[in-house]
C-alpha cells in the first residue's frame, strides 16, 4: 500500500511539474512572443522572462529571435535587475546588430545605468556610465525619437555630478578657503552650463565676492542670477543675499 502511495505521489509531482513547465511552453515563436509581451504589459516579469527564454531554446532560428532577446532585457528591467538587463541588451547588440530593436536597446542600457545612479553622497560610477551610454546613443542614432529623452537624461545626470562639486565649493567657503571655493564654482559654471548646479555655483561666486568685499560685483552677479529660472530654495537665498548686499552698500 505504501509503495503504491509513493508511486502515486511521484506521478502527481511529475504531472504538476509538467503542467507548470507546459504553462510556459508554446507551439510557435509567434505564440511565445505574444504571450511574453502580454506578460510584460501585465507586469508579470518572471513569466515574461521564462517565455522569452523558452522561445529562444525551442525556436533558435526563428525570425523573432532578436525580439525575444530584447524581451529578456525588458523582463530584467521589469524585475529591476538592471545589471542583468544591461547584459541582455548588450547581447542583442552583439548578436543582432542590425535588429530594429538595436537603437532602443542602446538607449535602455543607458536607462539601466541611470536607474542605478546614486545620490551625490555616494560613488558616481553608475552616473558616469549612464552619461557615456546616453551620449553614445545620441551619436549612434541622431535621428531617433528617443534623442530628446537621452539628452534630458544626460542633463539630469550631469547636474547630479555638478551638485556634488557645488557641495564641495560651499564647504570650502564655509571653511574659509575663498579662492578654492571660487575656482570650484567657476569650473562648474563652465563645465555644466544650463544645469541647476551651474546656477547654484553662480550664487557661490556671488558669496565669494561678498567675502572679498567686492559688494558691487556681488550685487551685479546676484541681479543677473535673479533673472534666471531658479528653484524656490535658491531664489530665496539670492533674494536674501541681495537685500544684505544692498544694505551694506548703503552704509558706505
What are these regions (language model features)?
Residues 2, 6, 17-252:
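Acidic, polar-rich low-complexity tracts and alpha-helical solenoid repeat scaffolds
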Residues 11-12:
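Repetitive helical segments and hydrophobic/amphipathic motifs
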